[in-house]
């Protein structure tokens, strides 16, 4: 939790010190950074507009994210060599279930939660065979993924 608390402190410092549009504060975590950012999102989701988790697993609390209604996008390769796609699928399902319990419709949940498990062809079409190692490279260059992230605006 130390890294998560440090990330929160740094975000708060930036928000307090600089002229930042608080309706557009985005978080992204890749691999181990995704584990840390999921902990951040489980502690202080209110600091962020949306969260993109790439090639990682969720280690944080789900309920705070659901309470805050912060949009979350999971991007991972179907054959991610480090995590596999199951941890992302499990986190997606857990958050989805919490939203259902809150009474949200599927269309409302779909605006808040995305599970994007990329097939092997997504990587091989770019000449890449290592899904985990190059997932972070490809995902941040993917216009659909980044368009989703930067299209989120906090009300």
Predicted feature residues:
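Gly/Ser-rich "nucleophile elbow"/oxyanion-hole loop immediately N-terminal to the catalytic nucleophile
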Residues: 2-31, 42
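Alpha-helical scaffolding within the catalytic cores
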Residues: 9-10, 55-65
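Alpha/beta-hydrolase-fold catalytic nucleophile elbow
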Residues: 28, 54-55, 75
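Short glycine-enriched nucleophile-adjacent loop
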Residues: 34-45
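A conserved short beta-strand
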Residues: 46-58
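Short, proline-enriched alpha-helix->beta-strand connector loops that line the catalytic pocket
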Residues: 66-72
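C-terminal catalytic histidine-bearing segment of alpha/beta-hydrolase fold enzymes
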Residues: 75, 81, 100-155
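Short alpha-helix in the alpha/beta-hydrolase fold that links the catalytic acid
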Residues: 83-101
């Amino acid at each position: 939790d130390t890294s998560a608390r440090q990330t929160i402190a740094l975000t708060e410092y930036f928000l307090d010190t600089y002229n930042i549009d608080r309706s557009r504060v985005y978080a992204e975590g890749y691999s181990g950074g995704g584990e840390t950012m999921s902990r951040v999102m489980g502690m202080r989701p209110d600091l962020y507009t949306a969260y993109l988790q790439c090639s990682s697993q969720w280690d944080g609390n789900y309920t705070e994210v659901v309470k805050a209604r912060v949009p979350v996008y999971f991007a991972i390769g179907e054959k991610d060599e480090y995590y596999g796609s199951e941890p992302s699928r499990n986190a997606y399902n857990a958050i989805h279930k919490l939203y259902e319990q809150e009474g949200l419709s599927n269309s409302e949940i779909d605006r808040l939660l995305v599970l994007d498990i990329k097939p092997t062809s997504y990587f091989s079409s770019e000449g890449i065979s290592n899904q985990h190692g190059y997932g972070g490279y490809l995902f941040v260059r993917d216009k659909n993924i980044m368009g989703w992230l930067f299209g989120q605006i906090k009300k």
